């Protein structure tokens, strides 16, 4: 599963899973706002995806611009799911 880890300007970190809902919302937002496709707006799209994932998970109630003012960095990571219990 993919997760996004946010490092805020105050030094704290938070992470959440990138859900299909967040991916679709970020894509739709980019299309509606005529952001350049692909690598031409990759950074903005990455930060917006992180914002949507955090908002959907209940980690922020701020708008995108206000949230961006609090962010130091984002990192996308791949985490393997917990292995299933073979005794179940």
Q: Which residues make up each language-model segment?
A:
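Charged interaction scaffolds used for protein-protein
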Residues: 1-13, 21-88
């Amino acid at each position: 599963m993919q997760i996004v880890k946010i490092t805020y300007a105050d030094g704290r970190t938070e992470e959440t899973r990138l859900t299909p809902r967040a991916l679709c919302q970020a894509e739709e937002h980019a299309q509606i706002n005529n952001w350049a496709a692909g690598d031409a707006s990759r950074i903005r799209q990455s930060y917006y995806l992180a914002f949507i994932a955090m908002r959907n998970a209940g980690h922020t109630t701020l708008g995108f611009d206000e949230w961006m003012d609090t962010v130091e960095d984002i990192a996308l990571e791949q985490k393997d799911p917990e292995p299933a219990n073979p005794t179940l």
